[in-house]
């Protein structure tokens, strides 16, 4: 599975998006996890999952999702590690 991480600064918290995609069993899947990092810690919701019969369909959707996410002001990160600014 491949993973992409995105962050978006939102007032006193950092919103996070994680895209996992690849072959799972006999299907190609994309899992989108939305989360948040704030003064109380980190949390991540259950994923939204998309299934595809063909790899090319999945890769096209990953490409479209990446473009849409970036157009909405999100930044792509290399890892899941994100520093949260202190508001003390």
Walk through the language-model features, giving the residues of each:
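A short, exposed loop/beta-hairpin motif centered on an aromatic-Gly-Thr core
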Residues: 5-7, 43-57
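Well-ordered alpha/beta subsegment
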Residues: 56-60, 64
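A short local loop/turn or secondary-structure capping micro-motif enriched for an aromatic residue
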Residues: 25, 38-40, 70
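Short N-terminal "domain-start" leader segments
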Residues: 1-34
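Acidic Ser/Thr/Pro-rich low-complexity disordered segments
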Residues: 34-46
């Amino acid at each position: 599975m491949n993973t992409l991480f995105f962050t978006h600064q939102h007032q006193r918290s950092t919103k996070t998006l994680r895209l996992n995609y690849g072959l799972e069993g006999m299907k190609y899947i994309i899992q989108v996890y939305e989360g948040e990092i704030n003064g109380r810690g980190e949390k991540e919701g259950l994923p939204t999952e998309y299934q595809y019969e063909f790899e090319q369909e999945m890769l096209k959707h990953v490409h479209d999702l990446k473009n849409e996410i970036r157009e909405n002001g999100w930044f792509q990160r290399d890892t899941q590690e994100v520093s949260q600014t202190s508001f003390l």
